[in-house]
Amino acid sequence: MNSAVSEAALIGIDWGTSSLRAFLIGPDGEVLEAVSSTRGIMSVEDGNFDAVFHDLIRPWISQKTLPIIASGMITSRNGWVETPYVQVPSGVSDLAAALVSFETSSGINVRFVTGMTTDHNGAPDIMRGEETQIIGATAAGLGDGTYVLPGTHSKWILVENNRIVDYSTYMTGEIYGALRSHTILRTLMEEGSFNEEGFRRGVTSGLAAGINLLHELFHVRTLPLFGKISGDMVADYLSGMLIGVELKAASEAFGKDSAITIIGRGDLADRYELGLELAGLSCRKAPENIVARGHFLIAKSAGILS
């Protein structure tokens, strides 16, 4: 048995739309090992989640029986086991009480974290996976305040007394993909490395756009047409504009008084950090793998760990 497995207390699984991560978690919530895959729920053929699950963590479960907690879109209608939603405000104890147990083909018991839901003027909002990351952030000492989780559907989440009290979803990433690939703007997009000047100009435009967004979007076509921006700036100008609109709306809804915590990885988190700075808002980045801390805290609250 390898030393990491012998020390482990828990396996945490973060299974989203486009990616899959698993963590071997120690007795104090530390990540001992991690593995990842591109087998998000939308790339699993014929709903064969059981096989993907076993393939990913077989080196661990073949050596030791460990409790397993899974979160993310794997609990959605398109996932492995659909779980209900808990209503905000909610915290770690609510999620722990609502865990859904499921037995795999090999007899392993997996506990799935439920999603969360809220209501804005009669329209529901939902999330799956982000709640576990927020629990991990509070365990990491990041505490109360506003969090942004960039992605295809960005989440802005308000935390008070270590409980999620409100949140909103913004379809920024998906709108960007649709505009870039399925509108007249697609003919202007050039592949290349990140163009910071184009992004900065786009954010500035987005922050000022307000209700004029549909008009401002046409400038993504006309600015390069008249040589106001170069071709290699267009994609990042569009990205910046949409992120700027999101930052303006969300910061007004959730407040600007304290530092906004960014939970995310790589280029997209960097873009939001730059965008927030351009908007005059203070921000900080959460440490990596905080979702594993969330798995650990939920498991502990549920009495799964001693």
Where do the PLM segments sit?
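Short glycine-aspartate micro-motif
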Residues: 10-14, 67-69, 145-149, 261-262
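Short glycine-rich, Thr/Ser-proximal phosphate-binding strand/loop in the N-terminal lobe
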Residues: 10-48
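Adenine-nucleotide phosphate-binding core of ATP-dependent small-molecule kinases
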Residues: 206-247
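Glycine-rich phosphate-binding/hydrolytic loop that grips phosphoryl groups
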Residues: 281-306
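Short beta-strand-loop/turn "lid" adjacent to the catalytic site in phosphate-handling enzymes
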Residues: 60-127, 161
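Glycine-rich phosphate-binding loop plus the immediately following alpha-helix
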Residues: 44-45, 116-206
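Glycine-rich phosphate-binding loops at beta-strand->alpha-helix junctions
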Residues: 19, 257-275
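A short acidic Gly-Thr/Ser loop motif
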Residues: 13-19, 73, 149-153, 172, ...
